[in-house]
Every structure is written in structure tokens, then in C-alpha cells.
Amino acid sequence: MERFVLCIHWERRAESGAEQHRVPQGLAYAQDIYTQLKEYSTKYTSTFPACSLTGNPGTRKWFFALQSLYGSFQFCSSDWDDLCPAVTTEDNEEPVQTALDECLEALQFPDGEDDNSRDSISQTNLFEEAAELLHQLSDKLPAPGRALVDVLLFTPEAPKLKDCLSAIGAIKHLKEWHSAKITIVSKDCKGWQKIAKFLSANVVESACPKELIDSHELWRGNIEISERKFTSEVEFPEFCLRSVSDDKFPYFEHNGDDKNKAVLLPEVFHYYGTSLEYVQMVALSEIPSYFVSDSVFELSITRNALQGKSKLMLDQLCSLTDKVGAIFMLSCNVCSLPNPPALQRSSKKWREYMSRKPKDIKVPGVELKGEYCSYYFLIQGKGSGFCKATLLHSASQISGAASLVLLHQRLNNYQPGNMAEGTSEILDSVPHFRGEQIAVRERILARAQALAVNEYLKRHEALPHPSVSHVNNLRTLLAVTRERVIGDCESRLDGVSYKNLQNITVSTPTVSESEAMISNPADWPERNVLQNLENFEKVKQRLRASILSSSAEQLLGRKDGLKEGMTLLDAKELLKYFTPQGIAVGELQPLQVQRGDNAFLLTPKLTPKKLKGLPFEKAAECHYHGLEYCLDNRKALDRDVAFSELQSRLIRYETQTTCTRECCPVPFALSPLPSPAVLSEPGSVPDGESIQTELRGEPLLLKRRSRDLDGLYASKRLAKSGSSDSLVSLASEGSGHQPPTRATRLRPERAASSTSAVQPPSARVQMAPSVPAQSKQSTHPDLEQKESRSQKHNRMLKEVVSKTLQKYGIGVEHPCYAACNQRLFDISKFFLKDLKTSRGLLDEMKKAASNNAKQVIQWELDKLKKK
């Protein structure tokens, strides 16, 4: 995970002239921290290995930011500074000025007019400015699971709580929603106790950089132990995973060595989960050796949780002996492109959430793109307050490693016998046949040879000039027949050694442990790591639900997870209802599931047998599970499917029309083609937005063209639905009658240009199928010539893709140009479809195209070579 360090300095300005020009103590501490971080960035720290074939995790980076409030002087970094050194630098290039240098320069050479005008600002307003600057920095943090945030607050004395309350709230935002570790460096420890308890922060007096920043930390989060039967869970916060040792060679030398090696997998982005989930206790003798990897880490608690329940949990884990361990799982999402910052955890959402004054602060769930993977750790006691976390290979990571290890073990354990016993072993290995088997083989051979000779004589007589001497041919035929028959009999008859034949009734051969483990499917180790897909989907739905919808929860009642959890059966309780053969003990009655406050009451004394004997009219009046489908003669399932398809098509068009213009009833028919609402994502740009933009630029033509636009929207609907038979009657706002207009079938890629088929509402035009599209007239040529927003974005993306391919040597004349162009266009468009705004769209297009160009080109070239 990448490390983000934020240094905050709050101090009152000295009034005497001698102390005004000195560097404040808090900024001096920040300089030491910055120097130490630069040293950390030149060292390579071993991280978690790859958990997917998508790629390897990238090298860990360090970022730094500064916020200083010194009297009325206010400074804050505009962005996070990357501290990782560049591999190559140009001689003529000037060094980039860091945020710390800018702060010291602004402090030593202040603007006189600005400085005098800020003297009258109150402390409350200054801290509100600081809070806003801190919120801007928090919005620039990456998606959750990729960054470890450390906040260091340097202040000689504690300010008044009512003055700094807004700034403390900004730090609380970093703590709760970005999992930041807060450390307060101050000599006034007693004054900070109340605020430190609110922030779950650690208050120290010294400012040694090595004590404040732990460079070995790779992950921070909670340990979660859940109980499935009662759907309860317990969390132990402030745990961390640390690397055992760091490599001492510089960062750029490590990168240079990697570039000389053959890179098998690209660098991808890993987003780790927030909790280590307990799986099970296990004996070390039960874990196969090929599941245990060589990667070993340390599990401990952070300095902010030296007391409390987390310390007790760590003591329990440290008590695990060498024979027993606990397995924990850490989830991870792997994506080739970085996920954007989570809007659900932005400063705006934080203010809205805190304005409701919640009792407990909950973290909103964020759905990340990419492949879902897992890390498994075997936790054992190590002593001195640490635990050893050994990385285990999961079932998806093993592939053929298990079979390969077993094969090597058998080859290594094989020991050839002595040469003195070689003769007896050779004789024992000779196949032993009974007399009956030999007699059967000879009878089969004689019958086969007789049939072969008869067939040969028939064919020989059928020849026009038969040869007199055919003794050699018969001799060859009999020899070939004998070889075929004996070979066939030896493959069919049971050939066992004489020694094994004697011992076969005395004792049975012992089965090795590895063979028993593989032959018994119930003991497969892969079964222990398989996840329940249904429970995983429920957890995802629970995380996806917004924490701001408290009013909706009151209307809908309890959540589905709580309602369904009340009717779950334990495994022992479930087995009571079935025999060992899997047959039900009796007629199983459906459980009465409580849905809200209204229970589904069954008809008393009604059983499936009685229900089968009732006529349709009486059975329809009964209340029993599934009657609406079992007794419905109108095909309710088919009607439900048709209604869901109808509803999915209506959603996009209804929201588009009601949100973009005045409500106008337009009856229309839908086509059986799939709806674009199913294929599109919520962040896509509607095609009608370009027309609205044009109308905003021409307010004088709004009234004159309102009727035409009504017809335009209706025709665009029909063009998108792709119907070639439906007729649409356009209802105008006045009393005039609108003629029916036929919408021609358009392909999906030409749906955006359907505005060229608009007909004037005041004219009656009858179009035959043979009339070409070029003969259609339109009253608004400016709407036809105007390029829509989606067309413009597609054109821009095609130009970017073409230029990117030319950079990699794939020109228009290249045989793979067309395939690479289309494939790279589709992939880039897929990564751009979730953008909420078009600001910086061109840069995002270039980034998406350049990140995927090499992979696409390699794919198409390999495909071309195979042809």
C-alpha cells in the first residue's frame, strides 16, 4: 500500500522581534519528517506478493503534504507530493520546489498588505480555512484500500476546542473514512487528552521521525470474527501487518535491475480490504506443505492501541503454540487501471452525514472495479508482543503445484532394491498365467487363423489369373494373425505376478496419506477455502446500501439480512428432516416467513394432498405458497418477464424526458429489441443533452421550436428502440392534430444521428419503404449539422487511439491496425464510461489508451502469428 503522510502545524506567532524570524518548532519537526521520508523512499520494502495472474503489485510510493497555521499565516499543499526519486533527470531541468520550501519562503518573505489584512481575522475563521484545505487534500486521496494515511499534528499547546472544532472535524474525517493514524506531538499532553480520545489519537512529547512513522507497515485495519448462526460479529481495531526486513539497496537500482529482467506480469493496482476475517483454527499437521509459502510477515497492534480489547486479542493470538494456528483472510481487488477517488467518502458527503448528528459513525461502502482475490495468513505466536503471519496459497493460486509436489515426493522417496535380489524380483515380475487362460488363448488363435485362411482362399479364387504358389503368402498371413491375437489376449487377460497372487488374499496394500487425501473428495484442502457465493452477494449488497437512507429504512422495515437470518437452520437441525439416503422424513411444510408486520397466513388444515384434489375455483381462494404460479392459467411467469423487460426500457426514456424538458404525454410502442438502459451505465451521457445545450445558447428560438423538439424527442425514442413497425402519434400542446410518423429501423451505432429523420409537425408526409433516407427534408438544418456530445467524444477517442497506435509503430498500413484500433477503442471506452464530468476528459482518454495499448498490440500480433 502507498504511504501518505500529512504534517499539520498549529502554533501562535511570537510577538517579540527576535523570535519572529526563527523557524517555528513545528516546521522544524516537519523538515525532519520530510528528510526521513525521502530516505525511506530510496529503499525498497518487500510488499505482499501477487494474488492474481492479472499482474504484480507496484512498488510502494511515499507522498507528503503540509498544512501550517502560524498566527494569521496560513499555508497548505495544493496536492500530495510524490517523494519517490526519478530514475533519470535532465541537467537543464530546474528542481521542483517542494511544499515545505514554499511554506518557509512565504513565511520568511510575507506579503505586507496581505499580512496586515489577515491580522483582524479571528481564530475560528482561521481554523475554518484550515478545515477546508484539509478537506481538499482528503478528496485527492486514492480509492480505499490503496493508501496508508498518517497524520502528524505538531502544536506546542492545545487551542480552544470551540475555535478549532471545524479543523478537528476534518481530521476526524480522515480518521473514520480514510483509516488514518493520528499522532499528536505536543508538550501539553493533558490539554490534548479530550481531543485525542475523540480522534483515537496517540499523544507523544518527542518528535523523533523513526518513532512517529513506521516504515515497515504494509497494512492497517481490524480483525473481524463473525458467528454465522446468530449473524453477529466482533471487531478488534488498530491491527497492522509489517514486513520482516527491508532491502538496503536504493530504489532506482532495484528498478533498474527489474527492467533488465524479463517481465512476465505487468504492474497492477491492489486495493486491500479493511479487516482480517477469521476463517478457522487448524492444526499444523493438517496443512499440506505445498500450501505454505516462504512469505512471512508480522502481525501486531499500532501504537494507538496499546491498551483495550485489541491488546487482549493479540495476547490470545500470541499464545498459539507451534502445533496450532489460526487462519485469517484478507480480501483484495486487483485492477489494471486505478479506481477513481470514492465519491461516497468525499468531504461533501461527510458534511451531509455529520449534519444528521449520527450516534455512531459508519463508513459508507465503496464498490471497486477489478478482480476479487484473497490472501490467507496462518497466525502463530512469535513472542515479545508479535505474531508470525505466514502467507498461505489459496486454491486458485495453487494450480498444478500440489500435483507437482506429490510427484517430486514420490520420486525422492523411491529407492531401488539391491542387485542381489534383482533376479528374484525379475522372476516375480514376470506375468503368471493359468492353464485355462493359455487354452482359451490357443482356441481363439486357431479360430482366427482358420477364418483368415478361408478369407484368403476366397479372394485368391476370385482373381482372374490366380498364382499357383502362394505358400509364402499364407505363412506371412498366419504370422501376422498370431501376433495380433496374442497381443489382444495379453491386454485382456489379468497378468499379475506370482508373489502378489499369493498375498492378495492375505493382506491388502496400504494406502499412503497423500493418495487417501486425493481419493477422498471430502478431505480435499480446496474445500476449506471455498466461499459461499450467496453470502458474499448479501455482504456486497449490504455494503452497497447507502448509510444516508435512514428514512427509506423506516419505510421499508428491517433489512433483508435481518429478516432472513431469523429463519436460517443449523446443520444439525436441518439433518433431522432427512434420512441418510437423502429422502425427506415426512411432508415438509413451508416455513412462515415474517415479512415486515404482515405475516403470510396459510389456510388452516391445508396440505399438498388436499390441494391437489380441489377444483381450480376453490384452490384459487386458498392461501398457500406458490399458488399464484401453480394454478394461474394466464402464465404469470411469462407476464412477469415481459413486464420486467417493459419496465427496464421505460426507465431511461421516462427519466430523460421528465428531467430535461416539460412533461408532454407521448404514447409510443416498444420494440422487442434489448433496451439501452440494460446495456448502459448510470454515468453515461444522454444523447438529448446536446439539444438542451443548444437551446440554452439560443433563448430567442425556444418558443418557436418547442413543438418541433417534441417531435424530435419522440422520433429519437423510436430510433433508439429500433422498431420498424410501430406508429407514434405526437400529442401537441395545442388542439391541433399531429400526423402519424413512421420511424425507420436504425443500427445502434447510428442511433445518435437519428435527428436527421425529423419531420415537421405541421406537414403530412407519407414515406414508403423504398424512399431513400437522403430524400427526407428537415426544417432545421442547424440541428442536423450540429455534432452531438456523444459523437464528439467518440471522435476524440478515435483520434487519441489512432495517435497512440502510431506511437507504438502500428500505422494505417499495418495489417493489425484495424483490429488494434477497434479493440483499443472498446477497452478505453469501457474505462471512461463511469466518468461523471467531461473535465479533463482528453487526459483520461490518453491515459486509458496508453495503459492498454501495449497489451492490445501484443494480443493482436500473437493472434496474427497463429494464423
Curated annotation (Swiss-Prot):
Gene Ontology biological-process entries: regulation of cell cycle; regulation of protein ubiquitination
Alphabetized UniProt keyword annotations: Cell cycle, Growth arrest, Ubl conjugation pathway
Biased amino acid composition, Low complexity: 724-735
Keyword DNA damage part of the UniProt annotation: no
Lineage top rank: taxon: Eukaryota
InterPro entries, per the entry: MTBP (IPR039061), MTBP_C (IPR029418), MTBP_central (IPR029420), MTBP_N (IPR029421)
Location of the region described as Disordered in the Swiss-Prot/TrEMBL record: 679-699, 724-793
Entry keyword annotation includes Secreted: no
Disulfide bonds: none
Biased composition (Basic and acidic residues): 779-793
Similarity comment text for this entry: Belongs to the MTBP family.
Function noted in UniProt: May play a role in mdm2-dependent p53/TP53 homeostasis in unstressed cells. Inhibits autoubiquitination of mdm2, thereby enhancing mdm2 stability. This promotes mdm2-mediated ubiquitination of p53/TP53 and its subsequent degradation.
Name of this protein: Mdm2-binding protein
Organism: Xenopus tropicalis
Lineage, top ranks: Eukaryota, Metazoa, Chordata, Craniata, Vertebrata
